[in-house]
Amino acid sequence: EEKSDHRHFSLSSGNYKYVIETQLFFKQQENPVFYGGFLTYEYPIQENKYNYLAPPLLNLSLSATFKRFDEKDSSLGYGLGILQSGHGYWNGVKEPNSRSLSVSPTFSYLINSRFGALSFNISKPYFLKGAFNTNEGDIGQGSNIWQFTVSLRKV
């Protein structure tokens, strides 16, 4: 099977960071056909030009893909992400709302098409600790976040 180079990217907080990441994934013929996860730790080196120091982040993501063995060569994926954020700082002052802990279960459906592999994903983050978990002063605020993504991978 021929492999081609590709790039993964994400938006940044604007700080230079140390990033330590490890991944472990397995592929097999029976279900789950693909499973594993990654662990990433990000630690900011210094404040950016706006005097912002991003919080350290610890991210654990686990996933498993189950092939349906149907005529569309589709598969179902299940995942769980855990993200812990430390405190960020503006001008050396601790951000009161930057520390958090969230858990995000994910469901995905992948189907092969004439254009490539088409994936539909839905994720629901739950904030266990941090600013989105509590409502200080009962001021009628809150969050109800859903994430939807559609991706096309062409080989």
Predicted segments — roles?
Residues 1-53, 152:
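Outer-membrane pore/translocation modules
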Residues 49-155:
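Outer membrane beta-barrel transmembrane domains
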